[in-house]
């Protein structure tokens, strides 16, 4: 399972004229399930994402996780957006292959599982809409961007 996480000042996702998710300071995570991924892989990726220290402490060092973005216990937002293109195979030709991505039904199930697990462990979780054509807006903070990947 893959997540491309970006530290943001704010972010939102829209489907048509409707805002489906919006956060202030926190993490925007583009999330992708790959073929063969399991609930255990989703749990492992979520634990890594929630514990990843990408927010600055009082000394300016990236040392704080999204659960404590100010060093005083304030949790940042988590905006989860499904994006199967992260699994693209780009090794040959000029057209990406999406064979490595989980099939849509399994991708949707794993994304829903990931969102439910995140909501159980973090106070501020917003989402996009699986399979929809979404418009994602964000203000990067840094920019600070990391590719997180776990194998089943």
Swiss-Prot record:
Domain observations: A Gly-cisPro motif from one monomer fits into the active site of the other monomer to allow specific chiral rejection of L-amino acids.
Keywords: Cytoplasm, Hydrolase, RNA-binding, tRNA-binding
Family according to the record: Belongs to the DTD family.
InterPro entries: Daa-tRNA_deacyls_DTD, DTD-like_sf
GO molecular function: D-tyrosyl-tRNA(Tyr) deacylase activity; Gly-tRNA(Ala) deacylase activity; Ser(Gly)-tRNA(Ala) hydrolase activity; tRNA binding
GO cellular component term, pick one: cytoplasm
Designated gene of the protein: dtd
Short name of one Pfam family: Tyr_Deacylase
Compartments (UniProt record): Cytoplasm
GO biological process, alphabetically ordered: D-amino acid catabolic process
The reaction(s) this protein catalyses: glycyl-tRNA(Ala) + H2O = tRNA(Ala) + glycine + H(+); a D-aminoacyl-tRNA + H2O = a tRNA + a D-alpha-amino acid + H(+)
Subunit structure comment from the entry: Homodimer.
Principal location class: cytoplasm
Taxonomic lineage: Bacteria, Pseudomonadati, Pseudomonadota, Betaproteobacteria, Burkholderiales
Function: An aminoacyl-tRNA editing enzyme that deacylates mischarged D-aminoacyl-tRNAs. Also deacylates mischarged glycyl-tRNA(Ala), protecting cells against glycine mischarging by AlaRS. Acts via tRNA-based rather than protein-based catalysis; rejects L-amino acids rather than detecting D-amino acids in the active site. By recycling D-aminoacyl-tRNA to D-amino acids and free tRNA molecules, this enzyme counteracts the toxicity associated with the formation of D-aminoacyl-tRNA entities in vivo and helps enforce protein L-homochirality.
E.C. code: 3.1.1.96
Protein name: D-aminoacyl-tRNA deacylase
Gly-cisPro motif, important for rejection of L-amino acids, short sequence motif: residues: 142-143
């Amino acid at each position: 399972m893959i997540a491309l996480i970006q530290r943001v000042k704010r972010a939102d996702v829209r489907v048509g004229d409707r805002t489906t998710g919006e956060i202030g300071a926190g993490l925007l995570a583009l999330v992708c399930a790959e073929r063969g991924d399991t609930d255990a892989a989703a749990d492992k990726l979520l634990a890594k994402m929630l514990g990843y220290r990408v927010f600055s402490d009082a000394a300016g060092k990236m040392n704080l996780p999204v659960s404590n973005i100010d060093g005083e216990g304030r949790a940042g937002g988590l905006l989860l957006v499904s994006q199967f293109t992260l699994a693209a195979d780009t090794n040959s030709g000029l057209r990406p292959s999406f064979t490595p991505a989980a099939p849509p039904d399994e991708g949707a199930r794993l994304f829903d599982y990931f969102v439910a697990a995140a909501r159980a462990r973090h106070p501020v979780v917003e989402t996009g809409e699986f399979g929809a054509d979404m418009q994602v807006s964000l203000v990067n903070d840094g920019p600070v961007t990391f590719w997180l990947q776990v194998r089943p």
